Amino acid sequence: MQISAGNSTTRRPVDQREIPQGTVSKAVKALMDEGLLEDGEKLLRNPDGRTLSPLRLGSLYATAGVKVTHAQEQPGHVTTALFGLDTTRVLGRTDDAADSWDQVADLVYRQVTALKETEDRVRASHGLPPLRMLGVGVEVGAPVYNGQVMPPSHERSKQPVPLAEKLHRLFEADPNVSRPIPVIVENDVNALAVLAIHEIHYTDPDLVVVGVFDEGVGGGLVMDGRLRRGNNGRAMEIGHLAVAFPPGHDLGQNLDGVEAETARPSATDTVYRARCTCGQLGHVDTLATPGRIVEAFGGGILEQISEIDALDVEFKRARETFKRSGAALGRALAHVSNTVNPNRIIMYLSPSLVAAEHQPDTAGAAYLAAVRAETAGAFAASDEPDYLRIRAFPPDPEAVALLGARAAAVCVLESFIEHALRLDGCRPASRRGS
């Protein structure tokens, strides 16, 4: 088995170890007996000419991934998909509206069980056994800690939502569920970071994954090949970095020194007077998000504003809006680069902002040009051309939801791997009893 050799150049200690051939063979046999691994389709040969038996993740198991979309910090829609273990095969999908966290838990439970029942009927018609569930992953656009959806830090009166616990109880009470089903609840940008780890096959040990959403800018930090969580499990709050004021300026005051109002930003605010949802001024979220770009321009549709060209009388104003917004985001990424010094930064953006980079004569092209210029100026930024790697969100909301569901499903697989490697803090006594 090639697994046994180890890789002395890797940053992850678990990858450096040379594992005895017998141990690898026993582990593979146990995983195949359980159905988590199965034989691949055709034999391979290594450079020495030896025949290798390829393995793949087993088709007996499935993982459910759930994306919960939000509207003003309340759940609005739940998308659940059933995936094969490699998360590239979508076995089924369903969507429903939700207006409370209790309803989210009930919906997820019903959606997962319904999708599994449908797939099991298909398998039975082909003489195959029912699926086994590796787990359920839920991605939410909010801070998450130990399976709880946490309230925003500036709203201390609100209580955490024990979403994982609610789902555990629902699955445990189901007489048709013969095995415990693990439930992993994760922040949306952290889930994208875990997805990135798997998509690059652990080749870059230190990553920052950034998501630029309408609601704000978030970041997931990967160090030594593992997702790192901050205080109370929170992701990186890149959107709350102050970038629009010189050091020493009181962020509770406007530029003229008068104490700022507490109202939320509106289209009538001047650019630098827009207030962040946390109540402060000058944050990245007040400048760099698609919604704020539209507000700063004075209204409209982002795609149409982005496509304004030099023949349009609004071109100069539109270009300056995109340039200012992109520079704010790039300045934040520069701070992240100098603080964390990652191998690379992967950033998810609106497809219209990504497409504009390839249309240099349009106003929207100024956005990524400014992002790249500010990021490249960071002291610790790599000079590699793909140090900042841009990925477009899918163009339609349904595809975005499926991406989130897939990322949530990958979080289940990553949790399984970390548990097997004893990296999750689970004590041996509790492991034996699980």
Which role fits each region the language model picked out?
Residues 135-139, 143-284, 291, 407-432:
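Phosphate-binding/catalytic loop of phosphoryl-transfer enzymes
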Residues 1-132, 172-176, 201, 246, ...:
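ATP-binding/phosphotransfer module of carbohydrate and carboxylate kinases, centering on a glycine-rich
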